[in-house]
């Protein structure tokens, strides 16, 4: 599995190195397995010049976690006292000790001080050096690697060493063990949208009445979900406030772009209180473009705005359309979300991540500007309906990104993500055709970025045939399995400890399990899931039979892509009410939600199968299929209005 490709913080080197290292040096990163699409070729010429970048460890990450829990805990006297952008940057900047010690090491090994510079965001030390110098410095060997699909070459090593005393000061070094994904090579995407389309059911296709008349009540909510159905399900009243700065942020990428014509058709049919021409505020990242023509409209973007606008109106949305059309037409990078995070946080910004699209884009028609760094303010609520398999990215990459979500939480930002549409399985390509993990493809594969403990992850439900949205319960979605389970990287969060233990006491699935952090003891003793991992989803919302307009036609759409913007829109509405009385935004909501499960509609039926198993089952209380349940807007509003 891919997670095993990178081992961080190993206590001692294994195997024999061509260049011996001092006794106090240890392996910092090692690639255990060469990806199948790459071939190791000859040693790099020792005279070759390498642009070296040393990522410095950020300060106070543990303190940041504790502080976020404190200002997010409803029992804390500091609840809601969020930090400013400047306070967050200052808190996490690499310490001067880290900078000085790493620089001193480089100079002691013959890298002259006038060759070393620090990046403008203070996160990296950088210098140019010959391959011979770097191999001696890191006790490694550099090779040329060839990508089998494209013939393109890349420079990397199998492993590298740093002094034991400096391990805690160094995040990672490039060029290092990572192999770049190659532009222009067709392959299965490791990142995907959380939605799929289906034809209108026959009952709607046969009727000759206008959809607005047909669906102007809740009688057919079991067949087609409209804004009226969502309001009935969650007791959502019509909005009346639009505080400047409280717009709902929606992330889009992979070339999925909304159509204004589709929005107008949806508004005129299902949300006539919203004027024609209403559109999100575009904040384009790295050459992205929106909107598009109706013939090229993306179902994901159309869904996100059509399902959320009726909830938040008269408030508006902000569209963070990300990456230039050249890249998004054939997204061949295993990394994801970092170019967006760069754009809203200059301190995070880096031009060297080998897993993300590089800018300026040298390709014909590519974005020729510099990588956008810190050019936009983050929204107070952000909805993300994209993701992939946790096993497809290095642990260090995911932990650095997860720490960034923590920083946004400290600033009062709520980040809501879809849990995925593959149950307990992963998706796309590696490591097996079934997308499950382990040598036999039976180990459950958790989702990315849904497992980060600083995000609010939303699973999917549907309304059974014949059910009344005003009085009948939803069940876990069945047309696809809602993503849920336990991380192989992150430990179970403190805020969910009791809820998860209660689940195991009431509805233990009986599967063999293992206990692992950072994939340290993956699949030991025949286990198929990580019992102590961060559990997800946190909550759920409607995720099937949703009516939208796409490419000018009404259609049904499903996926946890629908659930995430519904819950995000509800948080935006709650923020409106808190801001109106001088209170802060709700920020990171998970500690409050787990402390008050009574504000949810508990979902007790359904499961999320995968890997040849039944997966997990919905149960009373929290479960790894539908989380705490679906929102009851008035109860959620009363709860958050009662807090400072």
Curated annotation (Swiss-Prot):
Co-factor binding comment: Binds 1 Ca(2+) ion per subunit.
Matching PROSITE patterns: SEDOLISIN
Catalytic site positions: 300 (charge relay system), 304 (charge relay system), 561 (charge relay system)
Domain of life, source organism: Eukaryota
Propiece residue ranges: 19-196
pH-dependent activity: Optimum pH is about 5.5.
Chain positions recorded as Ca(2+) binding sites: 602-603, 621, 623
Name of this protein: Tripeptidyl-peptidase sed1
Encoding gene, per UniProt annotation: sed1
Cofactor(s) listed: Ca(2+)
Carbohydrate-modified residues: 235, 326, 332, 519
Coiled-coil regions listed in the entry: none
PANTHER family: PROTEASE S8 TRIPEPTIDYL PEPTIDASE I CLN2, SERINE PROTEASE AORO, PUTATIVE (AFU_ORTHOLOGUE AFUA_6G10250)-RELATED
Pfam families per UniProt: Pro-kuma_activ (PF09286)
Organism: Aspergillus fumigatus (strain ATCC MYA-4609 / CBS 101355 / FGSC A1100 / Af293) (Neosartorya fumigata)
